[in-house]
Amino acid sequence: MEEIFISILNLISNEIPQLSLVDEDYGQLETSEDTYPVTFPCALIGNMEADWEEIGMGTQKGIVTLTTRLAIDCYEDTHIGSGTTEKVAERLRLANQLYTTLQCSRHSDDMGPMFRTKTKCYSLPGMIKVYEYVFQFELHDDSAAKD
């Protein structure tokens, strides 16, 4: 699973160079500190979960769920009439770029393509906008199989 995770991080970093940080999500946006331990815009990948089905002989097939979060600081005044409403469109384009980068991507011979299953947008304290995408893919794991 680690090779898949690292491959996803590398793909995002290579395809979206305007991100200042691409990292594993370990709660950086939920910190109680006054400042976030990340730079923006950033992509955080985590909350991996799998439901497994035994195939036999130590081999399993799983459906893996993975969450990606694009976080952007929003200090521009973007109300209608401000002249900076284009900033909203820029954020949405960047969020869509994260989605299209991962949609149908494969990161191992043992996995199927990644498909988006859920989208959620929300704000965090400190004027941070988060675009969250949940992806699923099938994974064939024979790491416990006896030779």
Task: Give the ranges of each region predicted by the language model.
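Charged, amphipathic alpha-helical segments and their flanking helix caps
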Residues: 1-37, 44-147
